[in-house]
Amino acid sequence: MNSPSIHTIAPQNEQALLQRAQSLAGYNLAELADIALLPLPANLKRDKGWIGILLERFLGASAGSKPEQDFPEIGVELKTIPIDEQGKPLETTFVCVAPLTGNSGVTWESSHVRHKLARVLWIPVEGSRHIPLGERRIGTPLIWSPNDEEEEQLRCDWEELMDLIVLGRVESITARHGEVLQLRPKAANSRALTEAIGEFGQPILTLPRGFYLKKTFTAPLLARHFMQLSN
């Protein structure tokens, strides 16, 4: 098994990416931070994206914060997912920022959500709060695409949520909307407002929103993966 090393060049194919990710499995965050010369924060309250930034150094991600996938050369998105001792996800998974204006004629097929979730490298990371950040270990990665059933679930939720946005009802959307995909505010502070459409078609200011995968979607996805590993 390869030991972790920093990669500044993007992987040429999925197999190369998966090998890089597999080389991280079993290492804890402090060990990887030492190799990457990246300071380990006390916690993730102010550094929510820190684990992703750390892992990108070992994987050779090139997209940064652009709207395209993390590995645009091979069409793969990176998602880290905190898990408990049973391998179950501890929180929802951010997909992308939701467009609140200019949505006439937008379709699921051309949406950012579908583009981001077309091919995903999932990297589980221990996330239980009683484990100090530096001692949390990286799990075995998987590369995934939604099957027909998952794609249909995502499409139905996306269409329902986008209909509400277009109809000027963005502020009536709660985290309970959607079976597997939810829309909720994404802002570090409540002063970061963005333009949206109001109930009567008028421009309004509201908090930016993001699409998130619910745990009811990611839990069975991970369960299948861990089951395959144990067989």
Curated annotation (Swiss-Prot):
Transmembrane segments: none annotated. Gene3D superfamilies: DNA mismatch repair MutH/Restriction endonuclease, type II (3.40.600.10). GO terms for biological process: DNA modification; mismatch repair. This is DNA mismatch repair protein MutH. Belongs to the MutH family. Sequence-specific endonuclease that cleaves unmethylated GATC sequences. It is involved in DNA mismatch repair. Keywords: Cytoplasm, DNA damage, DNA repair, Endonuclease, Hydrolase, Nuclease. GO terms for cellular component: cytoplasm. GO terms for molecular function: DNA binding; endonuclease activity. The keyword Nuclease applies. It comes from Pectobacterium atrosepticum (strain SCRI 1043 / ATCC BAA-672). InterPro entries: DNA_mismatch_repair_MutH, DNA_rep_MutH/RE_typeII_Sau3AI, DNA_rep_MutH/T2_RE_sf, Restrct_endonuc-II-like. It comes from the Bacteria. Its main location: cytoplasm. It is found in: Cytoplasm.
